Amino acid sequence: MGSNLNPKEDKFSLLLDPLSVEDIRRHGREAYPHECCGALLGHGELVTKVLALRNTTDEGPRRRFLISPADYQAAEAEASSRGEQLVGFYHSHPDHPARPSEHDLAHAWPVLAYVIISVRKGEPGELTSWRLKEDRSAFDQMELTIGESGQETS
């Protein structure tokens, strides 16, 4: 697992390219009313590629997402082949705010970024980014910047 986001910083930030944001929004729209999920590849706070992944949960995809071990390994391999790291993941919250749930808290890993998009009645809305505290007690909201980064999407 490998982000190089600095865990000792007081303020965390993440930079997403506008095309990445559009890909996340489109994925959320297409998956609705289910949760979508995907990987964020890049360096540090810079996301250089968004990789859509399958939601493989058996627990009810309207309220949960699960990334299979094979898809996780494929995302790590893609990042490695590009000389990059797995910076984090994104997922949608259908008809709920773009805030981490208790389930998100229980299943997150420190050092990774978690982007959440709210999708209400099929329309993507608020986009937020979060990082789990080292003691796993809660999330800290990250500053999310949308700007040019020369990113690819898929």
Per-segment meaning from a language model:
Residues 89:
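Conserved, mostly hydrophobic/aromatic
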Residues 1-86, 94-154:
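Conserved beta-strand-loop surface patch within small alpha/beta domains used
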